């Protein structure tokens, strides 16, 4: 696998592939990779001739009191895992490469509406940071296809909306959430959990599953939500949000809506965990 922190190197290699009529898939990451990321790379390899990955801990998407400095950097292990999964080109830029004028002077991309709810309400500016860095990476790599995990459901919709609104010729593919045997969604932030917290953490998925089952049985949105919040608190969580939304727009779900998604974010110990369930009733 070729690794470079320089934009020109990435563009030169991609152009060489393009000159031969070959296709390119892209998987952007922040590193500290787990099996969910590796699944994205393997899926990417099945879609296109070549796979490009990136590792960049993006300061623009972290808030003032979030874990930017504490976010694990594990480049050697990540590189080995990416190579084994089929990535051929790895972009590892520094903040100075991506934001040479600094964050305050950086042109940014903002997707209105869908960026302002749920995680966007809890983490102001987060999705502006996500949209900006993903747009920059898309312009550098210029892939045919880009893959993202469904675990970050709101992020996936933000990126799909950005691509559609800006007429970017890139197919965005969401890949199913990869889970531990307990049902806990794999996340780089699971490493913050103590043994006791990790044992309790599957309650997040269990609460979401119970909400969906209740809705399908005719229970009200309010009833299933309050029951799920109580279960989370009993398990040691502090809920941030637990909401039922329209699966395509993330607007508040109405009783007549068929395409639904339950989205949750909750704190346990030092970790803020997110999960979701997309379903039709």
Swiss-Prot record:
Matches recorded under SUPFAM superfamilies: Nucleotidylyl transferase
Binding residue positions for beta-alanine: 61
Keyword annotations from UniProtKB, A to Z: ATP-binding, Cytoplasm, Ligase, Nucleotide-binding, Pantothenate biosynthesis
EC number: 6.3.2.1
Enzyme class: ligase
Catalytic center residues: 37
InterPro entries: Cyt_trans-like (IPR004821), Pantoate_ligase (IPR003721), Pantoate_ligase_C (IPR042176), Rossmann-like_a/b/a_fold (IPR014729)
GO MF annotations, alphabetized: ATP binding; pantoate-beta-alanine ligase activity
Ligand binding ((R)-pantoate): 61, 155
GO biological process: pantothenate biosynthetic process
GO CC entries: cytosol
Cellular compartments annotated: Cytoplasm
Superkingdom of the source species: Bacteria
Residues noted as binding ATP in the record, renumbered to the chain: 30-37, 149-152, 178, 186-189
Pathway: Cofactor biosynthesis; (R)-pantothenate biosynthesis; (R)-pantothenate from (R)-pantoate and beta-alanine: step 1/1
Family to which the UniProt record says this protein belongs: Belongs to the pantothenate synthetase family.
Role played: Catalyzes the condensation of pantoate with beta-alanine in an ATP-dependent reaction via a pantoyl-adenylate intermediate.
Further details from the record: The reaction proceeds by a bi uni uni bi ping pong mechanism.
PANTHER family from the UniProt entry: CYTIDYLATE KINASE/PANTOATE-BETA-ALANINE LIGASE (PTHR21299), PANTOATE--BETA-ALANINE LIGASE (PTHR21299:SF1)
Subunit structure and binding partners: Homodimer.
NCBIfam families given in the database record: cyt_tran_rel, panC
Protein name: Pantothenate synthetase
């Amino acid at each position: 696998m070729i690794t470079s922190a320089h934009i020109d190197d990435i563009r030169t290699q991609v152009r060489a592939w393009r000159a031969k009529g070959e296709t390119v898939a892209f998987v952007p990451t922040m590193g500290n990779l787990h099996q969910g990321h590796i699944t994205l790379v393997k899926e990417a390899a099945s879609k296109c001739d070549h796979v490009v990955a990136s590792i960049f801990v993006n300061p623009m998407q972290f808030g003032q009191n979030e874990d930017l400095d504490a976010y694990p950097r594990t480049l050697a292990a990540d590189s080995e895992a990416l190579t084994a999964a089929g990535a051929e080109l790895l972009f590892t830029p520094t903040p100075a490469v991506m934001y040479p004028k600094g964050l305050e002077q950086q042109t940014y991309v903002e997707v209105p509406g869908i960026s302002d709810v749920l995680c966007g309400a809890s983490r102001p500016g987060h999705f502006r940071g996500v949209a900006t860095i993903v747009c920059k990476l898309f312009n550098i790599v210029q892939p045919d296809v880009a893959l993202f995990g469904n675990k970050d459901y709101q992020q996936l919709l933000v990126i799909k909306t950005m691509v559609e609104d800006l007429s970017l010729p890139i197919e965005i593919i969401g890949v199913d959430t990869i889970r531990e045997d307990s049902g806990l969604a794999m996340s780089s932030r699971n490493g913050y959990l103590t043994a006791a917290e990790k044992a309790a953490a599957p309650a997040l998925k269990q609460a979401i599953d119970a909400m969906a089952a209740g809705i399908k049985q005719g229970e009200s949105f309010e009833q299933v939500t309050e029951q799920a919040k109580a279960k989370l608190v009993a398990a040691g969580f502090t809920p941030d949000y637990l909401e039922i939304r329209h699966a395509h727009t993330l607007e508040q779900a109405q009783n007549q809506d068929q395409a639904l998604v339950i989205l949750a974010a909750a704190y346990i110990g030092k970790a803020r965990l997110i999960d979701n369930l997309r379903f039709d009733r």
